[in-house]
């Protein structure tokens, strides 16, 4: 049995990571999407253990101390991390493991797993990104401003990634992301 591959997928909030990943995973059930842990509150419809592992800050910090995360970072006032053991288990089973994580987490993974493929998902424009974030209607103006500021940093880091995919037309973006992950 061959060893699997880790693929890191990063992109600004609102760029469409969830939509594209849903399409990719429906076409590639052999791939494994790592479920991240977070201290943020669940959004409507999100289920613990399916979308994220929702933890208190104290629980999260205990897991950091016990080195249970492959990577972790603070983003928009919340902690996010990738539980280590499921990733290692799935890679050892020969599966492609996708980590949907923030920029700082991607940088940590580059240090700990230099063979991981790093893919940045980009918006067609900052204006379109802002429209998508506002369309969610889940955040106040201050949170939107923070996300847009962070997006500038993330877009500026695109050169650090092995592949970049622009999410403009959905079908084209799905095809490009599929190639970035599996080829």
From Swiss-Prot:
Residues 4-182 form the Guanylate kinase-like domain. The gene is gmk. It is an enzyme of class 2 (transferase). PROSITE patterns: GUANYLATE_KINASE_1, GUANYLATE_KINASE_2. Its main location: cytoplasm. Belongs to the guanylate kinase family. ATP binds at residues 11-18. It catalyses: GMP + ATP = GDP + ADP; dZMP + ATP = dZDP + ADP. This is Guanylate kinase. GO terms for molecular function: ATP binding; guanylate kinase activity. Pathway: Purine metabolism. Keywords: ATP-binding, Cytoplasm, Kinase, Nucleotide-binding, Transferase. It comes from Synechococcus elongatus (strain ATCC 33912 / PCC 7942 / FACHB-805) (Anacystis nidulans R2). Its EC number is 2.7.4.8. GO terms for cellular component: cytosol.
């Amino acid at each position: 049995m061959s060893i699997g591959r880790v693929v890191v997928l990063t992109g600004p909030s609102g760029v469409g990571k969830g939509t594209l990943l849903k399409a990719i995973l429906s076409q590639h059930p052999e791939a494994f999407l790592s479920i991240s842990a977070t201290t943020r509150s669940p959004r409507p419809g999100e289920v613990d253990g399916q979308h994220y592992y929702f933890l208190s800050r104290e629980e999260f910090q205990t897991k950091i101390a016990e080195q249970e995360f492959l990577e972790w970072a603070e983003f928009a006032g919340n902690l996010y991390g990738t539980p280590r053991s499921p990733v290692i288990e799935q890679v050892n089973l020969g599966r492609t493991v996708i980590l949907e994580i923030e920029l700082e987490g991607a940088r940590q993974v580059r240090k700990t797993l230099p063979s991981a493929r790093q893919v940045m998902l980009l918006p067609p424009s900052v204006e379109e990104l802002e429209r998508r974030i506002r369309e969610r209607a889940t955040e106040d103006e201050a949170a939107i401003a923070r996300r847009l500021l962070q997006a500038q940093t993330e877009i500026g880091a695109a050169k650090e990634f092995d592949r970049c995919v622009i999410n403009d037309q959905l079908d084209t973006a799905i095809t490009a992301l599929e190639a970035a992950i599996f080829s």
